[in-house]
Amino acid sequence: MKLLSSICLIALAAPLFAEGPKVSAIVERARATAGTEAALNNLVTLQISGWIEPAESKMPSATILIISRKPCSQRLVVTVDDLVETTILQGDSGCIIRSNLSDEEKRSQIRTMTDEELKRVAFSTRQFFSFYGADFKRGERIEYEGIEQRRGVRCHKLLYSYPDGISTTRYFAINDDLLVSTITDKGVESVEVGEQIVAGIKFPKRVEYYQGQTMLHTMVVRDIKVNKPLKRGIFTIPTGQKTK
């Protein structure tokens, strides 16, 4: 029975890698640059705090706090001056809360996420734990798209795509397997800069975001906590929110 199950699993997984051996080898080497398989697979909770520096000086900066738990829970808090936007995802349900710290008498505005927002936030949450691996359970495919020059580096170009239309293109350096660039299906490019090791896993010191040749903003990572206890109810959807 175990043998039959294994054969079925291989049969299902095989089509998800275009040019299987080549793609799987690239992904395996790229994952090794982020940490050991044990360290990556044992990541269950992740807390990242820092701030966002806009490229244009006239735009205000923001503080950011991301709390995620495998497989699909996230709390994202972005604060700009007295305005706070909190995004909460818990499995198939999510909401967005907007608050004004300077007006304590004014009630927070809460709304349920749209289906598109829910899909995107769930995707971003899963990305925290995937470390370049394919999300087989949800039908993600990885296709090899050849060798390209990206940011002055010769790279393997891999296209990650889901059946629902979400896709990501990643560029991995040929010489050292490091991630050079990630581009979403919306055309936003992220480039990781610097490194810090936490619990045996490599994280960037900052992430730069671009649209084409134009820099949008930079996220500076101040602190990272791996597998630390989380506050009870941190992902609870406030009472009255619709659930799916």
Describe the residue ranges of each PLM region.
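Sec-dependent signal peptide recognition
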Residues: 1-9
